[in-house]
């Protein structure tokens, strides 16, 4: 069975409204804390005429309510009438609609129940529109759902809120029309003064942080930004001015030119201004380029080459000093950069860097660089040039140009690259031709003059927004000038108000204000927010969800109608603000004959307007606005609506970079969009003549306004709150705008009976909807929803008579008997009063801040006192004219919206409909609930599921425990068992004994083998060494003639067949071996020319006993060589055989022959033998020390890692199981806490306790097993050591146990590894023996230290390990693995910088590529790391190195210092280091035999042809030497011969099937090595890979 879950959601519309209310309260607080900004415009008469006409039409038609609400009063009441008709005559219902999205999914569930027993379905029931039919469908389908998981979501969307919101928005619009009654349009005071403040702050900051005075800052910034149209914002221009002043020290005209050019480049390149400033500063300081010249240079390069890699500005900043040293002009720099870029350079930095490198090298010449100059110009011209470098007669740019020109004439690309790299640096290796193009470009200078101005003009001309942007700049300039003037002029007024506020009298007055306002807020709080508490108290009751909707909405509207009118009404007290703006803005009435700046601006404005005609959007007159954009925004008209939307989306409307106040007035200001004002001025409103001149209603001069105020007189009454301010006296007379605040005093002291009169008498004090809405929202006993509607309409009319009419009208009585009846409300809003008090607590805190904010907001009271009375009377007359209009409308409203019978009918219909829809939803829920109860909320259902889970978990734990027991017992029986270890040692001992026995046997056989070998020595020479190189193949054409090489040469070799390259100076031992092989191929034999060898030998023989004594301390099995006298016997036998023949044929001195041909060679052999032994010992030691057993790796992978993996994963298994279960459990509200505690929590707790024991037991047993068996392991190790020592003592008669253990320690390690893991390796022995080829190749094995050095360098340079073989090959060929090697013979050494170290790098290459901190060229790791860096930069990969590439293609390593056999055509370097070599063609021709004889002679040997008669026996010289046999000294070396057999422990195994084969191979390897050493004399190492 599956799970079924139903979820009903009540869409929370109330919370969003509450958040809006909270935001209103916060804005109210900010308004009280911030400055009060008033704007006024006189449009009363026109609006009143429109209202009067519309009211007449309303009364003429028979309708319940003919009052429409629109967001633009200007559109006329025609739209209002249509909207009102829709509102009053339509059916007002709260529509609960259903959108059935569940049916399709239910059909799928019903059709697939047989296959979906464990599936998971989530049908969603979204209740939206027209519920009845859909709810029936849901009920039918739910009955079909069984064993599934469903989540129907019932969403109740109240469409009433949207309708009421629309009404509210239209009321707000109507209020806005009245609030802006006296707004003159144009500039808001907030934006003007904010602009002035921002400008003054910028100029002060720049002046304080630079060397420019404030006056010059303002003048230069305005000239650049406003007049020359440069820069993105005034602030950006001023900061650029500061940067350039600080970085260059320029002033006056030079600074202004730098700033303007820098700003234009920033716009042209769309670059960061600060980055442009840095580039200009560097060019000004180093190249002495003016702002205009720098701008022209950058603009020219940018137009012709772009901004390569975005580094043009950075290049100018970084390399200006290099350009200065080279004495380059701006035109030359531009031309060079463009040429180099078009030639293929990646960026400007590479080009400039090559210039800097050349400039350094031309003044600090090394020998190789001098040679490069001589190659290009000749010695004589080079000398002149160097002289010119020193005395300055040849500049850097001239020398670079000449070098580039000379290089272009070098046809050989390789030679050109070598010279250019030497003179220009490594950038040439990367770029090549672009460097030369750049250098040649220096020869000419680009014409950059005027480039910046042309590009900037084209940018402006092609931008369609340029006129708009220029208009905005003009407006910003005007706004800045006005704001600066206002802030400067109001300084004394602020001083006066500050003095009053800080005086004792002022403090007392403010305390009284605070107390009275707090009392007003408390009284309001008694009836505020009654709807919200009811919603909170009953929100969780799902069954009454529909009943909550309608009351909550009504309460919501009430809440909105309280705070908004309070905010806007109190925040805008004094609709007489028209006088404020008129007074602050100087009179600009045009006068004939004047020529002031203001007059010129007005004249131009009028002229432009006249040319545009009636369609002009720019109003004429002194207060006209620019065309572009909206300067101010009104929260109660189009601008305000859009502004609210923008704020809701989290967006802010800001100026480009300046102060936000440039575009946005503060939140407390009431403003109107310039677009609406323009329509007002042009007269394009609904119901009016678009061509009618409305300027008379807009342009009201200060004198006209003043006269109107005087004529009307003042009738304001002062209330309680601000009454103390009436007696402010001389302090208040000097504070502007204080009179406006005094107007609000008429509002204080009102009560339930006289509220209408009090609010109405304020006139413009609470303009617009604030007046009417306050009637319905603020005063106790008056309802909110209808009061707000009435207040919105009443506020449009104004006047104290309106308030009186409402106080005494039947409207209020009707309202009190319906919506405002205590009993009627108490039935629907239980528990509201207590919550209202808590909701209004913030108001008292808000008003408490008024005291502090008055200090910084009220202005000159004296000015206001003089003007207030006239303005007040004038405003009162305007309100009275609207009062009569209201009387005609009042009757219609009374019979509809304020009729108890009318409302009663509407409410009953809504209530009954909502109840019927909820009943349908309830029945659906009952059906769903039944299904859920039988599955997710059924203990029986859960019990079935849990049992299977529980049993499965138990089985898994049982299996885990049994597995661990098996593992534990297995470990205890093996690793911790003394018996087990003893068995393993036995198998190791058997292998060791077998090997030792074989070695011993070899030792015995070597002596006899040596005898046979000596006897067959000459036979080997005759028969050749075909077993190494195979038999000869078919000979190619005989075109090669061979030759003798005495100096390094590049030559074709092997082009006509096989050839031998035989060294005669570098490695004579190998040369002899190759000579013997070459002779064999040519059908010849080689014998030692004793005379030549002895005469060239130079070093006398030393005592063989002394030499051998130096190497008797061996670390390998030692072979007795005392039987060398047997070799002498073999020689003697051959001497005797032909002795008589020699006597008869030759008359010689027997004593001399004996000394030359027998004694000297034997002594030489004895003298050489210690070296052979020493090399064998050292090689063996290196092989042993570089070979690991792999025990650590085995234990890590086979033992430690499996356990660690289990530990790592166990946490995720446990956490995943618990988290998954918790997620499933918490997603369903089952109410089965007791069941879960019993069947889930406790079993898991028990599992947790048990598993803790299992885990600790597992690890504990493992540790205890290791520790408890420690003694047995120690004993086994001791026994192992004793047995190894004993075996070696007994078998080989060795008396140095420590050395024995050191030498053969790895056999024990191998045995341990094989005991842990026996592996059959079928071809092990063959693979090991195959490594002997390394000995014959002359390369030998790389020592362990070299390998470690190279691996360390590879890791330091983060190079792939695949480079190791190639690097080892290079190290072996270049230095032979010697980190201290220094080459003193090649061309580098002659030039003064020999190649050194492991990889034979020269100092300059090492320094160019060494890693930080690796500065020792003789340190092998440092040297190898630098070589790797050089290979990467030069060849990219190790496989591209010539020597490695040659070997990869089957050829030899490039360079033949050791000689070798050439089997195919190739190009190679021979005679390296001026070492002599012979190249001998492998053919039986005269040339080949001649060259072979010459090579043998150079090596102190002779060549014989066995095919000639008489040559089958010894030569006469050899026979003569035998006559000294009676004096022959038989010698016996007391030393030994050591052979290195290298093993790699990771590949050696032991088992029965391959033991004998392994031993045999080892024996054979020993025999082969010894035979090779005797016959050839090479230095070989038996390397077992």
Swiss-Prot record:
Keyword set, alphabetical order: Coiled coil, Phosphoprotein
In-chain residues carrying the UniProt-annotated modification Phosphoserine: 970, 972
Region of interest called Disordered, as start-end residue ranges on this chain: 586-627, 645-692
Pfam families with a match to the protein in the record: PhageMin_Tail (PF10145), SLT (PF01464)
CDD domains: LT_TF-like
Domain of life: Bacteria
Coiled coil: 12-59
Compositionally biased residues, Basic residues: 645-655
Compositional bias of kind Polar residues: 618-627, 661-672
Database matches in InterPro entries: Lysozyme-like_dom_sf, Phage_tape_meas, Transglycosylase_SLT_dom_1
Sequence similarity: To B.subtilis XkdO.
UniProt protein name: Uncharacterized protein YqbO
Gene name tied to this protein: yqbO
């Amino acid at each position: 069975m599956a799970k079924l879950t139903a979820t009903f959601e009540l869409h929370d519309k109330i919370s969003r409204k509450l958040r809006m209310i909270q935001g209103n309260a916060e804005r109210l607080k900010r308004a009280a804390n911030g400055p009060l900004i008033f704007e006024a415009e006189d449009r009363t008469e026109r609006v009143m005429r429109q209202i009067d006409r519309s009211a007449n039409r309303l009364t003429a038609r028979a309708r319940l309510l003919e009052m429409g609400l629109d967001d633009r009063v200007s559109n006329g009441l025609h739209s209002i009438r249509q909207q009102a008709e829709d509102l009053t005559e339509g059916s007002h219902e709260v529509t609960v609609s259903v959108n059935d999205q569940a049916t399709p999914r239910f059909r799928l569930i019903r059709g697939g129940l047989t296959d979906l027993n464990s599936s998971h379905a989530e049908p969603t029931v979204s209740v939206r529109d027209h519920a009845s039919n859909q709810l029936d469908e849901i009920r039918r389908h739910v009955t079909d759902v069984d064993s599934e998981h469903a989540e129907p979501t019932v969403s109740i969307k109240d469409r009433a809120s949207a309708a009421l919101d629309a009404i509210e928005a239209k009321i707000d619009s109507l209020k806005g029309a009245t609030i802006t009654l006296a707004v003159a349009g144009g500039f808001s005071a907030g934006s003007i003064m904010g602009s002035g403040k921002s400008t003054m702050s910028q100029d002060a900051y720049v002046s304080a942080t630079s060397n420019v005075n404030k006056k010059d800052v303002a003048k230069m910034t305005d000239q650049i930004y406003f007049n020359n149209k440069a820069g993105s914002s005034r602030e950006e221009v001023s900061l650029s001015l500061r940067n350039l002043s600080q970085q260059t020290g320029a002033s006056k005209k030079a600074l202004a030119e730098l700033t303007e050019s820098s700003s234009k480049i920033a716009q042209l390149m769309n670059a960061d201004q600060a980055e442009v400033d840095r580039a200009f500063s560097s060019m000004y300081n180093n190249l002495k380029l003016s702002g205009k010249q720098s701008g022209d240079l950058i603009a020219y390069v940018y137009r012709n080459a772009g901004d390569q890699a975005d580094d043009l500005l950075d290049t100018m900043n970084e390399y200006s000093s290099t350009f200065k040293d080279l004495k380059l002009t701006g035109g030359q720099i531009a031309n060079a950069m463009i040429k180099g870029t078009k030639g293929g350079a990646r960026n400007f930095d590479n080009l400039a860097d090559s210039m800097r490198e050349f400039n350094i090298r031309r003044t600090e010449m090394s020998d190789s660089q001098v040679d490069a100059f001589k190659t290009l110009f000749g010695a004589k011209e080079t000398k002149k040039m160097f002289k010119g470098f020193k005395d300055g007669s040849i500049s850097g740019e001239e020398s670079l140009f000449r070098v580039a020109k000379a290089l272009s004439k070098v046809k050989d690309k390789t030679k050109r690259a070598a010279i250019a790299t030497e003179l220009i640096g490594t950038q040439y290796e990367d770029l090549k031709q672009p460097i030369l193009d750049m250098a040649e470009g220096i020869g000419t200078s680009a014409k950059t003059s005027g480039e910046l101005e042309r590009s900037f003009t084209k940018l402006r001309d092609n931008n369609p927004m340029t006129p708009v942007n220029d208009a905005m700049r003009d407006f910003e300039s005007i706004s800045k000038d006005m704001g600066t003037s206002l802030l400067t002029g109001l300084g004394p007024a602020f001083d006066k108000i500050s003095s009053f506020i800080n005086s004792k009298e002022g403090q007392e007055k403010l305390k009284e204000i605070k107390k009275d306002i707090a009392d007003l807020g408390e009284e309001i709080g008694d009836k505020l927010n009654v709807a919200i508490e009811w919603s909170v108290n009953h929100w969780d009751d799902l069954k009454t969800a529909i009943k909550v909707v309608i009351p909550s909405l009504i309460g919501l509207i009430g809440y909105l109608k309280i705070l908004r009118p309070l905010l806007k009404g109190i925040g805008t007290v004094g609709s007489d603000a028209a006088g404020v703006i008129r007074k602050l803005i100087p009179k600009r009435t045009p006068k004939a004959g004047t020529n002031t700046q203001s007059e010129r601006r007005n004249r131009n404005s009028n002229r432009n307007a006249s040319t545009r005609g009636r369609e002009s959007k720019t109003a004429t007159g002194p207060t006209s606005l620019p065309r572009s954009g909206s300067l101010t925004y009104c929260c109660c008209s189009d601008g305000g609506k859009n502004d609210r939307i923008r704020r809701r989306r989290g967006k802010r409307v800001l100026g480009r970079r300046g102060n936000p106040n440039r575009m946005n007035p503060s939140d407390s200001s009431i403003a109107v969009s310039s677009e609406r004002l323009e329509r007002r001025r042009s007269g394009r409103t609904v119901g009016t003549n678009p061509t009618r001149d409305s300027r008379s209603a807009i342009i009201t001069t200060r004198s006209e306004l003043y006269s109107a105020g005087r004529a009307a007189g003042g009738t304001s009454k002062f209330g309680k709150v601000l009454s103390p301010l009436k007696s402010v006296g001389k302090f208040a007379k000097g504070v502007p705008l204080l009179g406006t605040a005094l107007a609000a005093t008429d509002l204080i002291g009102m009560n339930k009976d006289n509220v209408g009169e009090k609010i109405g008498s304020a006139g413009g004090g609470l303009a617009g909807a604030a007046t009417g809405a306050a009637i319905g929202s603020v005063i106790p006993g008056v309802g909110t929803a209808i009061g707000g509607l009435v207040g919105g309409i009443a506020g449009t009319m104004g006047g104290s008579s309106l308030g009186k009419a409402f106080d005494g009208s039947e409207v209020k009585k009707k309202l009190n008997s319906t919506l405002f009846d205590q009993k009627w409300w108490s039935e629907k809003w239980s528990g509201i009063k207590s919550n209202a008090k808590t909701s209004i607590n913030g108001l008292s805190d808000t008003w408490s801040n008024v005291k502090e904010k008055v200090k910084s907001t009220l202005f000159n009271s004296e000015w206001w006192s003089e003007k207030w009375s006239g303005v007040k009377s004038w405003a009162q007359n305007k309100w009275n004219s609207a009062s009569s209009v209201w009387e005609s409308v009042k009757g219609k409203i009374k019979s509809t919206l304020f009729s108890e019978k009318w409302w009663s009918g509407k409410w009953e219909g809504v209530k009954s409909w909502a109840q019927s829809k909820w009943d349908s939803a309830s029945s659906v829920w009952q059906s769903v609930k039944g299904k859920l109860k039988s599955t997710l909320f059924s203990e029986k259902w859960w019990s079935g599921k849990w049992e299977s889970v529980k049993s499965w978990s138990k089985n898994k734990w049982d299996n885990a425990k049994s597995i661990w027991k098996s593992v534990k017992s297995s470990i205890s029986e093996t690793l911790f068992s003394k018996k087990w270890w003893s068995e393993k040692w036995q198998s190791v001992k058997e292998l060791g004994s077998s090997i030792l026995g074989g070695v011993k046997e070899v030792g015995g056989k070597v002596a006899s083998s040596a005898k046979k070998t000596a006897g067959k020595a000459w036979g080997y020479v005759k028969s050749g060494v075909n077993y190494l190189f195979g038999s000869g193949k078919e000979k190619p054409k005989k075109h090669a003639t061979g030759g003798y090489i005495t100096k390094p040469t590049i030559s074709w070799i092997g082009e006509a067949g096989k050839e031998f390259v035989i060294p005669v100076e570098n490695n004579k031992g190998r040369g002899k071996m190759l000579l013997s092989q070459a002779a064999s191929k040519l059908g010849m034999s080689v014998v030692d020319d004793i005379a030549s060898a002895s005469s060239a030998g130079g070093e006398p023989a030393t005592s063989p006993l002394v030499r051998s004594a130096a190497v008797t301390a061996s670390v390998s099995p030692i072979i007795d060589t005392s039987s060398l006298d047997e070799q002498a016997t073999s020689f003697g036998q051959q001497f005797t055989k032909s002795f008589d023949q020699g006597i008869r044929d030759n008359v010689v001195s027997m004593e001399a022959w004996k000394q030359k041909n027998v004694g000297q060679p034997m002594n030489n052999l004895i003298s050489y033998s210690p070296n052979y032994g020493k090399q064998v010992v050292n090689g063996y030691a290196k092989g042993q020390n570089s070979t690991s057993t792999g025990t650590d790796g085995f234990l890590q992978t086979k033992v430690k890692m499996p356990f660690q993996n289990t530990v790592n994963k166990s946490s995720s298994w446990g956490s995943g199981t618990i988290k998954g279960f918790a997620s499933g459990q918490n997603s369903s509200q089952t109410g089965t806490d007791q069941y879960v505690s019993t069947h889930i929590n406790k079993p898991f707790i028990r599992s947790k306790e048990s598993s803790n024991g299992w885990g600790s037991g597992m690890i504990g047993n493992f540790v205890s097993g290791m520790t408890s068996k420690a003694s047995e392991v120690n004993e086994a190790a001791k026994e192992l050591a004793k047995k190894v020592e004993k075996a070696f003592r007994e078998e080989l008669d060795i008396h140095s146990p420590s050395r024995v253990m050191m030498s053969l320690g790895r056999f024990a390690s191998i045995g341990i590894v094989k005991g842990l893991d026996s592996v059959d390796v079928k071809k092990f022995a063959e693979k090991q023996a195959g490594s002997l080829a390394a000995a014959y190749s002359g390369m030998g094995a790389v020592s362990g230290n070299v390998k470690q050095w190279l691996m360390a360098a590879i890791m330091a340079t983060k190079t792939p390990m695949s480079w190791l073989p190639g690097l080892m090959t290079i190290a072996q060929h270049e230095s032979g693995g010697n980190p201290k090697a220094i080459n003193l013979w090649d061309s580098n050494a002659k030039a003064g910088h020999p190649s050194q170290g492991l990889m034979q790098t020269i100092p300059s290459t090492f320094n160019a590529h060494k890693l930080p901190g690796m500065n020792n060229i003789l340190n092998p790791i440092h040297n190898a790391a630098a070589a790797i860096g050089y290979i990467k930069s030069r060849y990219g990969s190790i496989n591209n190195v010539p020597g490695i590439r040659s070997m990869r293609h089957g050829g030899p390593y490039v360079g033949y210092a050791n000689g070798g056999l050439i089997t195919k055509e190739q190009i190679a370097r021979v005679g390296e280091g001026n070492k002599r070599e012979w190249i001998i063609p492998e053919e039986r021709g005269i040339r080949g035999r001649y060259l072979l004889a010459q090579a043998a002679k150079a090596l102190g040997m002779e060549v014989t042809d066995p095919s000639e008669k008489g040559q089958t026996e010894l030569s006469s010289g050899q026979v003569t030497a035998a006559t000294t046999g009676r004096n022959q000294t038989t010698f016996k070396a007391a030393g030994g011969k050591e052979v290195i057999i290298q093993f790699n422990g990771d590949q050696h195994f032991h088992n029965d099937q391959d033991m004998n084969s392994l031993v045999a191979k080892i024996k054979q390897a020993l025999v082969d090595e010894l035979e090779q050493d005797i016959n050839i004399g090479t230095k070989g190492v038996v390397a077992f890979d």
